[in-house]
Amino acid sequence: TECPDDTGLVAKITNICYKHQLNIIKNSEFVENETKRFFMRTELNGIFNDETLLTDLKFTLPEGSSYKLLPKQRKRIVILVTKEAHCLGDLLMKNYYGGLDVEIAAVIGNHETLKSLVERFDIPFHLVSHENLTRVEHDKLLAEKIDEYSPDYIVLAKYMRVLNPEFVARYPNRVVNIHHSFLPAFIGAKPYHRAYERGVKIIGATAHFVNDELDEGPIIMQNVINVDHTYTAEAMMRAGRDVEKTVLSQALELVLADKVFVYKNKTIIL
């Protein structure tokens, strides 16, 4: 639920749940102080009549409200890759051993470098090459292949191409990227080399939703590790890869559990 803040909202919503004989398992709420916007996430079990429940919410909540009733079910993702294996490999292993509750429907690459890795896990791999194509032409072919699998989310696991605005608009707040720096520092390419040149003492990674601006989408998860003057750019890169794969999988856990609200180009995690 997302709506203008008002007195007694939690009581009103929970009373509707009680009226429908639904048991509240977990409840989290937050008020954004500047805009007085109320956010609430409630986990329920019981026998649902979606239409009447949503109608009751509509007539109870203030004007300008939005709300969704989401079944607890396994999500589907399509992963996009280029040549780097660490983030993809981590997701494949976690998924295989039950550490990440998701269906990896397919992996799509603009190179075939990671095809053999993916096929070891009996997951389809598709090559959608960008050779001799404009960015718009390539992204159109990419979207067509993605849509064959009807994924809930698209994951950029070190996919090293910038997506065009039309592609991004097709999947609003459904494309998750891992960026190899602690944004907003060192956006774009070769962040570890620039971090080394700057003499930074921490390096990090950022998982975010993709929007029209390069590396400017709503941030879902970040983390850092300490480094010092003894680290070369290559050593920073190796250490950074560990942070990248951890941050990406943690962000996906939140997204797949429907815990992430997007508001004003930032996220609220409940």
Model-inferred region functions:
Residues 6-26:
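Short amphipathic alpha-helix segments
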Residues 1-9, 47-48, 81:
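Short, surface-exposed ligand-recognition loops at beta-strand->loop->(often short) alpha-helix junctions
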Residues 30-270:
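One-carbon transfer enzymes
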